[in-house]
C-alpha cells in the first residue's frame, strides 16, 4: 500500500506541470496601429519605443499600454539604443532632415540635435557610434540621397564627430572632392568595448575613406583610399603610413585585434585582398591565408571566445544581394591572428556554402553547416539528387573535433525518413540562421531544420527542434517553422508558426513551453496575424514578457502588436536553491584550459528564476594539466592528415626564424600554447630541427616568391581558365575522369564530387565567360555559370553521348544545343544517327529540334545585321547517306525549314561571317559566304599559275572586315602548303597575300596575327616549294612578317649576337640568306599557345634559329621581341616554354622537354633574367599557363616527377606578387605623376595604316600593372596621308616585282557590275583601278591608287543614272563661250600691242630675234614682244618643215610611180595612236615605280 501511495504521489507530481500549463493563460494585450516599422527596448527595463507611421510611441509596461512621445514631430527613420548605455540612452533619427533626437532617461524626455550637413539632400540616412566609456563622444555618419533633374540618384557620405551635440567637426579625406564618388566613409572608436585590449588611448578614432572613379571608356574603375587615425577624439588626423599606397577595402575593430583588408589591385574591385592584423593600432602585419581572399562578407569578421579571428569568405563581395545562403568558406586564425586556416570537416574538400555560428555565452561551442553549390530556386529544386551531401555539425572544443547533430526522440522516431540511431547517416541539418540572435540560456536552444542523410534539403519539409545540451542532441517539437524566442533564461519558450497549416493559412495562435520544451501550451489570438517579429522585452533573456508584431490579413492591412506576459505563471513563484542544477559545457571537459558550468532551473521545477535584468552567470575552473587541445601549431607549422604539426616551408620562408640564425638549421617548437588559455601545467614540447639552407635569404627576391605544390596520382589532361577578371578560376580534368576546380590559379585545388560519375568532357561557353559544362559518363551534365562556385545538375536526353561539342547562343546564356545519338545500341548501327536537342532553360528541359543534325549555329546571334534574329543553321547528314546539307529555320524547325545547300562538306562561323564549303565538279571545293544568313555569295579566289583545283582550304579568322583563308596548293602528306588569301569587306573577293605558306595534314597553318597590334602577321613559307612539289627535296621553311596586313612581307631581322654575346655564324646583308626563323602553329602541342599576348603589347616569344632556313626544334633557341617583331633578341639557349604575366611585366621561361627545378623570369621586359628554384626535385614541366588575359601575377606549372611513385604528377603555383614594392600609378588624365608613358613600338616613328600610334608602357620595374587595360589606352597622335603601304592589290591583280599591282595575264578585273546584282538599289558602278584600300587603314588624302574611273550605269538604271549625272548644256556653253572670249581678248591684246603698233603683219618677216626695232615702253611691252618673237619662230619652223615635207613627199611619190607604175597605192595609217601609246606606256612605267614612295 505504501508503494502504491508513493507511485501515486510521483504520478501526480509529474502531471502537475501539465495541469499548470493547461490552466495557466498568459496575459495578452493587443494594440492596433497604422504601421509599425521599428520597435526597440531599453536594457534591464520594461520600457519600449516604437515608430508608427505618423508618431513615436513609448510603453513603460512591456508593451501593454502605449502613448505618443511629445516633442518628436518629424517622421522617424530609425531608432538606436546605445549599446553601452542601453538602460537609459537612445537616439531617434529623422528621415527628411539631418537631425536626431536623444533621450538619456528611457524616453521620458528628448532633446533635438541638428547635424550641420554641408549639402542639401532629399533624404538622410544617419547612424551613430557611441563610446564605451566616454558618454559624450559620438560619431555620426550620414548618407545623403539626392536626385537630379534627370532622375539620376547620387549618394553622398559625410562623417562628423561631436561632444554630445555641443559642437560638430566634419571628418574629411585629404583627397577631397575628386572624380567619382566616396563609396566608403566610416569612423569608429578604437576602444570597441569596456574590456578592449587594444592599445591607444580612449579618444582614438580610426576612419576610412574610399573613392571609386569610373572610367567610362573601358568600363573599369579606379579605387583610392585613405585610412586615418586620430588620437584626440577627432580634432586632428594622420594617415597610417603602412597603407599610404594601398587601397583599403574595409576594416573591423574587434576586442583583441584590428583587421584591415587591402585590395591588391586598385583597378579591379574584384581583386584579391591582403589581411592586415594589429593589436596596438600602431604596427600591422600581413596574415597568412591558404589562398588569396577576394570576398569577405560584410559584417562577418568576428572573434570567438578565445580571441581567434573568424572570416566568412563569400564567392561574391556583396553577399547581401545574393540568393544563395551563407559564405563559401570560413577561415579561422590562430590566437595571434596571423595565420588563417579553413574549417577542415567539409566533405571531400568540396565547394559549397558554409554557415558558422558560435554563441558567445557557450564557450568553445561552434555550429557549422555545409551546403553544396546547387542553386535553390524553385526552378531547380527538381534536381535534388545532389552529388554532394549537406553537412551540419557541432563542436564543443573550439572546432578541434566535430560531430553530427544527433536526434534523440523516441516519440517521433517513426516520422523521420531514416534511422536516427545512426547519426553518421541520419542527423539534423540546418542553416543556423536562428542562432545569430539567440538569447542567453544554459544550453537551451531551438532551430529549424530537416532530418536526413543530407542528400536533399527541401525547404517545405523544415520542422522545429529543441536542444537542452547546447546542440549535441535534438528533439522535434513542431512540424512547422516559425518565430521563436526564450525568456527567464530558457525556462519560457514562445513559438508562432509562419503558417498554421499546409494551405498557408495565417496563424491564429501561438505556442509556449514552461518546462524547457518538454510540453507545450497554446493560445488563441484575437486576430490572426502574419508574424514578422517575436522578441523578449529584456535583451539578456532574463525577462518573462514578450512582444509579437505583425500585420493583419485584411483588405486594408494594419499593424498588430501583442504584449504577452508570463510573470504570473506558477502563481508568481520564484525558484529556490533546490530547483536548480549544474549544467556543464562540453560534457564537463576542459575548454580553453578550463571547465565551465551554469546553474539552471531543473526542467520540471514549478517556478521561474525571476532574476530579471541579471545576466547569465558562468562558473570557470582552470584545468590543472595542459593537453593537446590547449595548443595550436606554431606559425611555421601546419597540421597534416593525422593532426600532427609539420613544417611548412612557405611559412618558414615568410617568418624570420632562419634570418635570425647563423646556423644551417634552427630548432623550433611545433606547438604553441593558445593565447589566453587557462590551463596551469604546460606540456613538454619537443623542438623540430628546421634546415635553413633551402630558405631564401632576407632581402632576396626569391624570398618574396611563393610556390604552392599540389600532387596528383593521375596526369592532368585538360585544363582551362575562365576568362574573367573576377578571379583566377580554372577547371582541370585528369586521365581517369576526375574534375578539379581552383579559384586561385591552382594554389588550392578541390575535387568536384560527382558521386562516382566520371567526367568525359568539359566545354566552355565562348560567349559567356563564367559558364562551363561538365559531361558525366552516366548521362548527367553539370552546369556552372559562376566559374565553378556552384553547379546545377541536369539530365541529358535519353540518347547516346556522341562527344560532339555544344553549340551556344551568343545572346542567351541558358540556350544551347546538345547532340545525342538515337537508335544507337551500337555506335556502328546503321540506324544510329545524331539528333539536335535544344534547351532554353540551361538544361532543365530539352526538346528534340532536328533529326540527323550534326552541327548547328545560332546564326541570328552571330551577324551584325541578321536577316532574322532567331535564325538557326544546321548541317544535316541523313541516315544511309554520306551527303550533308545545310538547312535553316527561324522557329527552331517547328514549322519553318529551308534548304540552303543540298550538298556541302561543312561550314563554320567567324567574325560575323558564315562560310560554307560546297563540293564542285572534278573533286574541287567552292566557298560561299554570308554576313546576314539570307544571301550567300561565292567566294572568288584569284587566278594564279600555281592554284589548280580547290581541294582544301582553311579559314584562319576574320578581323577588321576581312577573312583570311589558306588555299592548299599541295596536299601531299608531310609536305603540305598553299597560298594565303585575304577577302574584301563582305568576304566574297579574295586576293593572294603570300605563296607556299606552310600547313600540316590536319589543316593547321603557320599563320599568326600578333595580338593587340594592327596588321602584324607572321607566317612560315616553304622556300623550295617547286622542288617539294616535284618530290625533289624536303621542305625548307623560312619565317616572314608583315606590318601592313599582308600587303608587304619581309624576313625577320636577326639579332647581331646570341644570348652569350657571340656573333651568329651567318652575317649576310641579304635577309634571304641570313634571317631569323621560328617554329610555328603547325608544331604546337597546345593550339592555345601563341607567340604574342593581347595584353603584353609588342612582345613575342618564339623558338627558332638564325640562318638561311628553319632548323629542327631541338636545335633551336628561344627569342624575344618587344617591338612587335621589328627586332629580336636571343634570351635562352635551347627551346623553352613561355608565358606572360602582368601585361608583360613578368615574363617566365621554362625549359622544354628537359627536367628542371628552376624557371627563369624577367621583370624588365626581357632585358635581364633571373632564375628561381621552385621545387626540390627536378620535374618535367609539360606546360606553364596563367589567366587568358595574361594580367595575373600567378603562374601554374604542370609537371611530372618521374620515378617517384604515387603523386608523381604535380602542379606548381608560383606567385610573384610580393616581389613588387607597389602598384603602378596610372592617371588617365595625364595631370599627375604616373608610372606609364606613351611611346611608339620600336624605332618605327612613321605612319602605319594611315595613322601614327603610341602605346602605354610602364617605366618603373618595381611596380606591377594589375588590371589596368593598357591596350585600351593606345592613342593616335597623327592622321596621315595615304601612301603605297595603305593599298593592296585588287581581285585578279598581283603584286609585281616593282611593287605595282598588275592584271594577271589573260584575265580581266572583277566585273564591277556584279555589285548591282547584290545591291539592287545602286545606280552606278565603277571599274577597278587594280588597287583597294586596306580595311585597317584610316589615311586621308595623299596617294589615291584606288581612285575609280568614270561611273557606269547599272543595267536597267540608265534613266536614273542620267538623272543623277545630267548633261548640263547651258553650263558647257557658258564655259565654252568664256574660253573663247579669253582667247579672243588675249589675241587682240597681243595684236594691238605687239603687231599693229610695230607696223602690222607687213613687218612680220622683218622681225629678227634680238631686233631692237620693236617698241618697248614698259614691262608689258617686253612680254608682248617676247610672245610675238616666239610666235614668229614657231611660224617659221612650221613653214619650213611643211615645205621640206612637201618636197620629200613629191620626190617619194615620183619614185613610187616610177617603180610601181599605175598600181594602187598603200592605205596610209596615222602614227599618232602608236606614238601616243608608246609614250603612255613609257610614262606609266615611270610613274609605276611606287615602291620608291616611303611612308
From Swiss-Prot:
The chain crosses the membrane at residues 1370-1390. Disulfide bonds: none annotated. GO terms for cellular component: cytosol; Golgi apparatus; membrane. It is found in: Golgi apparatus, trans-Golgi network membrane. Glycans are attached at residues 148, 479, 769, 986, 1279. It is a single-pass type I membrane protein. Keywords: Glycoprotein, Golgi apparatus, Membrane, Protein transport, Receptor, Repeat, Signal, Transmembrane, Transmembrane helix, Transport. GO terms for biological process: Golgi to endosome transport; Golgi to vacuole transport; protein targeting to vacuole. Coiled coil: none annotated. Residues 1391-1495 are cytoplasmic. BNR repeats lie at residues 58-67, 101-111, 229-238, 394-403, 465-475, 511-520, 740-750, 837-847, 1119-1129, 1161-1170. It comes from the Eukaryota. SMART domains: VPS10. Its main location: Golgi. PANTHER family: SORTILIN RELATED (PTHR12106), SORTILIN-RELATED RECEPTOR (PTHR12106:SF27). This is VPS10 homolog 2. It comes from Saccharomyces cerevisiae (strain Lalvin EC1118 / Prise de mousse). The lineage of its organism: Eukaryota, Fungi, Dikarya, Ascomycota, Saccharomycotina. The gene is VTH2.
Amino acid at each position: 500500500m505504501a508503494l502504491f501511495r508513493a507511485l501515486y504521489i510521483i504520478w501526480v507530481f509529474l502531471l502537475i506541470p501539465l495541469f499548470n500549463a493547461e490552466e495557466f493563460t498568459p496575459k495578452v494585450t493587443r494594440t492596433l496601429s497604422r504601421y509599425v516599422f521599428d520597435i526597440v527596448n531599453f536594457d534591464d527595463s520594461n520600457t519600449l519605443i516604437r515608430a508608427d507611421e505618423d508618431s513615436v510611441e513609448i510603453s513603460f509596461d512591456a508593451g501593454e499600454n502605449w502613448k505618443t512621445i511629445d516633442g518628436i514631430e518629424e517622421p522617424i527613420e530609425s531608432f538606436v539604443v546605445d549599446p553601452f548605455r542601453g538602460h537609459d540612452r537612445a537616439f531617434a533619427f529623422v528621415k527628411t532632415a539631418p537631425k536626431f533626437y536623444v533621450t538619456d532617461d528611457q524616453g521620458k524626455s528628448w532633446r533635438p540635435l541638428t547635424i550641420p550637413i554641408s549639402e542639401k539632400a532629399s533624404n538622410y540616412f544617419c547612424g551613430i557610434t557611441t563610446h564605451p566609456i566616454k558618454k559624450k563622444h559620438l560619431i555620426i555618419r550620414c548618407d545623403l540621397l539626392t536626385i537630379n533633374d534627370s532622375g539620376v540618384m547620387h549618394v553622398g557620405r559625410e562623417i562628423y564627430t561631436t561632444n554630445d551635440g555641443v559642437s560638430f567637426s566634419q571628418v574629411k579625406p585629404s583627397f577631397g572632392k575628386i572624380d567619382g564618388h566616396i563609396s566608403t566613409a566610416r569612423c569608429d572608436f578604437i576602444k570597441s568595448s569596456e574590456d578592449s585590449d587594444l592599445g591607444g588611448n580612449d579618444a582614438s578614432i580610426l576612419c576610412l575613406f574610399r573613392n571609386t572613379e569610373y572610367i567610362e571608356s573601358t568600363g573599369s574603375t579606379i579605387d583610392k583610399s585613405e585610412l586615418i587615425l586620430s588620437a584626440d577624439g577627432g580634432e586632428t588626423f594622420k594617415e597610417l603610413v603602412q597603407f599610404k599606397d594601398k587601397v583599403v577595402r574595409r576594416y573591423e575593430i574587434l576586442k583583441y585585434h584590428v583587421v584591415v583588408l587591402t585590395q591588391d589591385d586598385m583597378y579591379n574591385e574584384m581583386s584579391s585582398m591582403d589581411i592586415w592584423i594589429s593589436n596596438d593600432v600602431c604596427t600591422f602585419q600581413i596574415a597568412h591565408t591558404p589562398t588569396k581572399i577576394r570576398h569577405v562578407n560584410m559584417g562577418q569578421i568576428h572573434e570567438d571566445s578565445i580571441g581567434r579571428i573568424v572570416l566568412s569568405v563569400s564567392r561574391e563581395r556583396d553577399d547581401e544581394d545574393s540568393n544563395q545562403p551563407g559564405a563559401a568558406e570560413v577561415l579561422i586564425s590562430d590566437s595571434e591572428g596571423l595565420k588563417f586556416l579553413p574549417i577542415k570537416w567539409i566533405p571531400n574538400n568540396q565547394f559549397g556554402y558554409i554557415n558558422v555560428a558560435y554563441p558567445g555565452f557557450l564557450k568553445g561551442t561552434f555550429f557549422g553547416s555545409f551546403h553544396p553549390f546547387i542553386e535553390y530556386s524553385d526552378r531547380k529544386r527538381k534536381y535534388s539528387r545532389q552529388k554532394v551531401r549537406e553537412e551540419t555539425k557541432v563542436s564543443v572544443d573550439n572546432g578541434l573535433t566535430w560531430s553530427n547533430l544527433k536526434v534523440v526522440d523516441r516519440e517521433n522516431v517513426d516520422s523521420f525518413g531514416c534511422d536516427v540511431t545512426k547519426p553518421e547517416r541520419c542527423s539534423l541539418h540546418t542553416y543556423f540562421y536562428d542562432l545569430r540572435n539567440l538569447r542567453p540560456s544554459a544550453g537551451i536552444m531551438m532551430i529549424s531544420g530537416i532530418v536526413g542523410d543530407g542528400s536533399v534539403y527541401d525547404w517545405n519539409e523544415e520542422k522545429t527542434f529543441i536542444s537542452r545540451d547546447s546542440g549535441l542532441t535534438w528533439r522535434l517539437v513542431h512540424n512547422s517553422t516559425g518565430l521563436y524566442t526564450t525568456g527567464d533564461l530558457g525556462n519560457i519558450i514562445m513559438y508562432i508558426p509562419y503558417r498554421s497549416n499546409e494551405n498557408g493559412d495565417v496563424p491564429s495562435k501561438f505556442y509556449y513551453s514552461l518546462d524547457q520544451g518538454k510540453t507545450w501550451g497554446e493560445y488563441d489570438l484575437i486576430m490572426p496575424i502574419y508574424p514578422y517579429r517575436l522578441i523578449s522585452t529584456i535583451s539578456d533573456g532574463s525577462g518573462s514578457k514578450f512582444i509579437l508584431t505583425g500585420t493583419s490579413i485584411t483588405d486594408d492591412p494594419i499593424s498588430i502588436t501583442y504584449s504577452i506576459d508570463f510573470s504570473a505563471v506558477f502563481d508568481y513563484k520564484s525558484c529556490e536553491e533546490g530547483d536548480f542544477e549544474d549544467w556543464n559545457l562540453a560534457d564537463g571537459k576542459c575548454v580553453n584550459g578550463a571547465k565551465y558550468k551554469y546553474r539552471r532551473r531543473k526542467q520540471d521545477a514549478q517556478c521561474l528564476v525571476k532574476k530579471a535584468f541579471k545576466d547569465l552567470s558562468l562558473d570557470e575552473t582552470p584545468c590543472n594539466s595542459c593537453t593537446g587541445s590547449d595548443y595550436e601549431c606554431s606559425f611555421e607549422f601546419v597540421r597534416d592528415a593525422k593532426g600532427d604539426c609539420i613544417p611548412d616551408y612557405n611559412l618558414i620562408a615568410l617568418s624570420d626564424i632562419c634570418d635570425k640564425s647563423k646556423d644551417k638549421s634552427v630548432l623550433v617548437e611545433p606547438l604553441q600554447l593558445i593565447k589566453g588559455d587557462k590551463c596551469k601545467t604546460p606540456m613538454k614540447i619537443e623542438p623540430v630541427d628546421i634546415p635553413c639552407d633551402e630558405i631564401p635569404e632576407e632581402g632576396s627576391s626569391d624570398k618574396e616568391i611563393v610556390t604552392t605544390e599540389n600532387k596528383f596520382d593521375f596526369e592532368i589532361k585538360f585544363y582551362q581558365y575562365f576568362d574573367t577578371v573576377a578571379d583566377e578560376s580554372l577547371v582541370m580534368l585528369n586521365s581517369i575522369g576526375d574534375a578539379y576546380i581552383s579559384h586561385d590559379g591552382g594554389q588550392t585545388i578541390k575535387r568536384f564530387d560527382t558521386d562516382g560519375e566520371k567526367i568525359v568532357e568539359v566545354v566552355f561557353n565562348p560567349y559567356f565567360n563564367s559558364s562551363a559544362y561538365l559531361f558525366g559518363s552516366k548521362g548527367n551534365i553539370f552546369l556552372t555559370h559562376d566559374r565553378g562556385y556552384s553547379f546545377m545538375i541536369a539530365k541529358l536526353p535519353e540518347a547516346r553521348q556522341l562527344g560532339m561539342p555544344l553549340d551556344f547562343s551568343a545572346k542567351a546564356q541558358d540556350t544551347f544545343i546538345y547532340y545525342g545519338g538515337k537508335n544507337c545500341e551500337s555506335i556502328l548501327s546503321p540506324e544510329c544517327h545524331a539528333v539536335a536537342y535544344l534547351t532554353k532553360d540551361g538544361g532543365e528541359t530539352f526538346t528534340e529540334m532536328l533529326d540527323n543534325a550534326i552541327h548547328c549555329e545560332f546564326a541570328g546571334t552571330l551577324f551584325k545585321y541578321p536577316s532574322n534574329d532567331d535564325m538557326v543553321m544546321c548541317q544535316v547528314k541523313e541516315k544511309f547517306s554520306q551527303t550533308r546539307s545545310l538547312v535553316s529555320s527561324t522557329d527552331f524547325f517547328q514549322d519553318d525549314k529551308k534548304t540552303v545547300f543540298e550538298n556541302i562538306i561543312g561550314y563554320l562561323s567567324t567574325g560575323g561571317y558564315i562560310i560554307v564549303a560546297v563540293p564542285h565538279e572534278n573533286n574541287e571545293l567552292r566557298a560561299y559566304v554570308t554576313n546576314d544568313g539570307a544571301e550567300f555569295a561565292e567566294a572568288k579566289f584569284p587566278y594564279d599559275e600555281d592554284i589548280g583545283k580547290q581541294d582544301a582550304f582553311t579559314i584562319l579568322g576574320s578581323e577588321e572586315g576581312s577573312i583570311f583563308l589558306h588555299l592548299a596548293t599541295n596536299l601531299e602528306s608531310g609536305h603540305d602548303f598553299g597560298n594565303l588569301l585575304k577577302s574584301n569587306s563582305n568576304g566574297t573577293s579574295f586576293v593572294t597575300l603570300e605563296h607556299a605558306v606552310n600547313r600540316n595534314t590536319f589543316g593547321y597553318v603557320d599563320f599568326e596575327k600578333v595580338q593587340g597590334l594592327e596588321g602584324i602577321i607572321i607566317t612560315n613559307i616553304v622556300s623550295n616549294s617547286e622542288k617539294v612539289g616535284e618530290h625533289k627535296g624536303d621542305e625548307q621553311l623560312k619565317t616572314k612578317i608583315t606590318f601592313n596586313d599582308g600587303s608587304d612581307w619581309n624576313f625577320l631581322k636577326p639579332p647581331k649576337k646570341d644570348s652569350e654575346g657571340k656573333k651568329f655564324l651567318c652575317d649576310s646583308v641579304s635577309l634571304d640568306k641570313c634571317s631569323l626563323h621560328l617554329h610555328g602553329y603547325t608544331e604546337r602541342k597546345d593550339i592555345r599557345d601563341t607567340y604574342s599576348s593581347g595584353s603584353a603589347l609588342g612582345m613575342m616569344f618564339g623558338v627558332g634559329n638564325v640562318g638561311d632556313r628553319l632548323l629542327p626544334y631541338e636545335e633551336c633557341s628561344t627569342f624575344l621581341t618587344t617591338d612587335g617583331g621589328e627586332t629580336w633578341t636571343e634570351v635562352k639557349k635551347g627551346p623553352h616554354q613561355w608565358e606572360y604575366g602582368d601585361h608583360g611585366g613578368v615574363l617566365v621561361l621554362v625549359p622544354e622537354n628537359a627536367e628542371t627545378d628552376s624557371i627563369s623570369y624577367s621583370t624588365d621586359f626581357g632585358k635581364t633574367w633571373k632564375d628561381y628554384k621552385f621545387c626540390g626535385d627536378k620535374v618535367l614541366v609539360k606546360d606553364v599557363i596563367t589567366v587568358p588575359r595574361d594580367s595575373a601575377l600567378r603562374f601554374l606549372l604542370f609537371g611530372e616527377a618521374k620515378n617517384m611513385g604515387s603523386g608523381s604528377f604535380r602542379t606548381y603555383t608560383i606567385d610573384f606578387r610580393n616581389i613588387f614594392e607597389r602598384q603602378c600609378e596610372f592617371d588617365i588624365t595625364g595631370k599627375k605623376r604616373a608610372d606609364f608613358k606613351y611611346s611608339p613600338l620600336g624605332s618605327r616613328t612613321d605612319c602605319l595604316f594611315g595613322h601614327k600610334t603610341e602605346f602605354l608602357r610602364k617605366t618603373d620595374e618595381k611596380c606591377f600593372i594589375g588590371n589596368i587595360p593598357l591596350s585600351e589606352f593606345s592613342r593616335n597622335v597623327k592622321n596621315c596621308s595615304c601612301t603605297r603601304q595603305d593599298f593592296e592589290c585588287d581581285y585578279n591583280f598581283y603584286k609585281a616585282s616593282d611593287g605595282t599591282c598588275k592584271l594577271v595575264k589573260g584575265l580581266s578585273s572583277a566585273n564591277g557590275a556584279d555589285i548591282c546584282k547584290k545591291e539592287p538599289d545602286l545606280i552606278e558602278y565603277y571599274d577597278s583601278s587594280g588597287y583597294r584600300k586596306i580595311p585597317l587603314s584610316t589615311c586621308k588624302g595623299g596617294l589615291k591608287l584606288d581612285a575609280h574611273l568614270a561611273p557606269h550605269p547599272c543595267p536597267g538604271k540608265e534613266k536614273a543614272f542620267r538623272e543623277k549625272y545630267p548633261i548640263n548644256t547651258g553650263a558647257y556653253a557658258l564655259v565654252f563661250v568664256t574660253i573663247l572670249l579669253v582667247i579672243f581678248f588675249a589675241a587682240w591684246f597681243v595684236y594691238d600691242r605687239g603687231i599693229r603698233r610695230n607696223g602690222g603683219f607687213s613687218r612680220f618677216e622683218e622681225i629678227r630675234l634680238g631686233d631692237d626695232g620693236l617698241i618697248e615702253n614698259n614691262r608689258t611691252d617686253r612680254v608682248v614682244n617676247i610672245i610675238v618673237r616666239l610666235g614668229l619662230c614657231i611660224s617659221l619652223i612650221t613653214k619650213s618643215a611643211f615645205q621640206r615635207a612637201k618636197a620629200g613627199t613629191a620626190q617619194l611619190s615620183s619614185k613610187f610611180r616610177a617603180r610601181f607604175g599605175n598600181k594602187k597605192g598603200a592605205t596610209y595609217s596615222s602614227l599618232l595612236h602608236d606614238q601616243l601609246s608608246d609614250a603612255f606606256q613609257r610614262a606609266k612605267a615611270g610613274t609605276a615605280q611606287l615602291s620608291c614612295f616611303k611612308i
